[in-house]
Amino acid sequence: TASATIAREIHGAAEDKGVGFLDAPVSGGQAGAENGQLTVMVGGDAGNFERAERVIDSYAKAITHVGPVGSGQLAKMVNQICIAGIVQGLSEGLHFAKCAGLDPALVIESISKGAAQSWQMDNRWRTMVDGEIDFGFAVDWMRKDLGIALEEARRNGARLELTELVDRFYAEVQAMGGR
């Protein structure tokens, strides 16, 4: 993830040279990249998007042209804000279950069939419960992405109080050696 401002600056430099440019961040992590299952959020001119779509399709399961240059990065910021909040909520929910004397596996079996279901729940709950920190996305990278999103929020006036709090929690994980 990069800032929308950087994407716009690169676009300007590319345009000066007569080169088309798209900002097209991805979601899906290493496993998604290895399996051609990435989700791509594309910002840029519609004509450039149409010319590049077949190439992007070779490594993506989903491609969405979300708007002009910079929009791809902004959509990725939304993705990261959501993931950070979901992971925090899942972690706290599982902690609550353990403290309440519930079997986390049974709780997950139940709630994963309802409105709380998410990719993070399906793929991360076991490592959280077992204390096996298997970061598919490093803490440092999440902090970078949240920092970019929070900076953009300061520019556009969005209030992201929960994201600020979750970012502080990630900072605590970093302070304990999480990378």
Residue ranges and their predicted role:
Residues 51, 70-179:
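Helical "substrate-binding/catalytic lid" subdomain
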Residues 1-3, 111-112:
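A broad, low-specificity signal for short, low-complexity segments enriched in glycine/proline
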Residues 2-81:
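Rossmann-fold dinucleotide-binding core
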